[in-house]
Amino acid sequence: MKSVIFGLQWGDEGKGKITTYFSKDYDYVVRYSGGSNAGHTVMYEDFKVVHHLLPSIHAKYEVGAIISNGVVLDIEQIVLEIEDYISRVGRIPNLCISNLAHVVLPQHKLFDGLLESVKENNAIGTTKKGIGPAYADKVHRFGLRLADFEVDFKEKWNFISHLYKKLYRIEVEGYDGLLKAYEKIKRYILPHVEIIDLIEQNNVLFESTQGVLLDLDIGTYPYVTGANCNTTGIQNGVGYPVKVEKYMGVFKAYLTRVGNGPFPTEAFEEEGENLRRKGNEFGATTGRPRRCGWLDIPLMKYAIKVSGATELIMTKSDILNGFDKIPVCVEYEINEERVSDIKSVVELEKAKPVYEYFKGWESHNSQSFLDFVNFLEKQLKVKITYISIGPKVDQIVKL
């Protein structure tokens, strides 16, 4: 069995918890895109783990973790995560890392921050973790891979340092730190063909980062991440034409966004602050407050279409417990015309939400909540199979 769990919104949908919950049914969880800009928080009964690069494996089961070639790896960060995992869980994770994964360098992080600062009002609002610059150098064909540490690391480091000095006037230290970090993760690194063998021969759960609407190609460009975090990124992200059977799309019962970009259903002032406070909507990676708003049906339809979602999982419905009424955007008004489907996310800049209001609920057992779920299924034409009813990994209900 090959399945994928991915976000249908702008990230922060609760994919980490959902992936962890289902990971016990698989041999490996595979991260295929992104970098340390991801923040997947998993809460157990007695401790919490935040994954930035480590796949969201269940700490209480023997599940393997694979970081594939599509990930850009901050090797100093992964060392910290492994150490933190060991201290909390009490054992070393069964981790395999592709030797073809590219490395995030100190130059990338510094350049990321500088680029945001000079953009001023056009800034994207990145995490400044160097993800975009690392992918850019990969495309420019002077990126550094894990495999290069065993061949000509010093020569490549000097070349990259020379380029950044000449092109951007950026000079940083980092050679010794990278070497030390590499030595600590060397035991986990495998030739990529062996990664493919593991994927071929086992039941695998692919774990996406961010969300479909942040995908480099079909997201709300330019306010996107540097990677293909849609399900279409799996093939490139593992370097193998894998066949996926289940596409599990995760969405929150409301909507959030970090950074800049269009957000038609954004709630402001007291309304937005109430959602942010109740949902604890602060970034796991940066701590930044998330922009909060209401569920957006036209945008969900778009995300489902481009991702191929075969089933849906709703999270954080419990955050809306006790609300008198729940707004849901069912249509947009664009250029004085009503539309229920969008052809392109470019249209979002002009979109004004048209809301339908639903009676609030006290719990997931309330009839008003079940009516809400039935409405969503009719609108989206995809079955909602599970709902998350709390922050802990086992607080999930099958419908």
Swiss-Prot record:
Active site as annotated: D12 (proton acceptor), H40 (proton donor)
GO molecular function: adenylosuccinate synthase activity; GTP binding; magnesium ion binding
Catalytic activity as recorded in UniProt: IMP + L-aspartate + GTP = N(6)-(1,2-dicarboxyethyl)-AMP + GDP + phosphate + 2 H(+)
Matches recorded under Gene3D superfamilies: Adenylosuccinate Synthetase, subunit A, domain 1, Adenylosuccinate Synthetase, subunit A, domain 2, Adenylosuccinate Synthetase, subunit A, domain 3
Positions bound to IMP: D12, E13, G14, K15, N37, A38, G39, H40, T127, R141, Q210, T225, R288
CDD domains: AdSS
Named cofactor requirement(s): Mg(2+)
Key word Metal-binding present: yes
PROSITE patterns on file: ADENYLOSUCCIN_SYN_1 (PS01266), ADENYLOSUCCIN_SYN_2 (PS00513)
Cofactor: record remark: Binds 1 Mg(2+) ion per subunit.
BP terms from Gene Ontology: 'de novo' AMP biosynthetic process; IMP metabolic process
Record's signal peptide: none
Alphabetic keyword roster: Cytoplasm, GTP-binding, Ligase, Magnesium, Metal-binding, Nucleotide-binding, Purine biosynthesis
Subcellular location per the Swiss-Prot or TrEMBL entry: Cytoplasm
Positions contributing to substrate binding: A284, T285, T286, G287, R288, P289, R290
Keyword Signal among UniProt keywords: no
SMART domains tied to this protein: Adenylsucc_synt (SM00788)
An example Gene Ontology CC term for this record: cytoplasm
Pathway noted in the entry: Purine metabolism; AMP biosynthesis via de novo pathway; AMP from IMP: step 1/2
Pfam family, one: Adenylsucc_synt
Residues engaged in binding GTP: 11-17, 39-41, 290, 316-318, 388-390
InterPro entries: Adenylosuccin_syn_GTP-bd, Adenylosuccin_syn_Lys_AS, Adenylosuccinate_synth_dom1, Adenylosuccinate_synth_dom2, Adenylosuccinate_synth_dom3, Adenylosuccinate_synthetase, P-loop_NTPase
Cited function: Plays an important role in the de novo pathway of purine nucleotide biosynthesis. Catalyzes the first committed step in the biosynthesis of AMP from IMP.
Family: Belongs to the adenylosuccinate synthetase family.
Known partners and oligomeric status: Homodimer.
Name of the protein: Adenylosuccinate synthetase
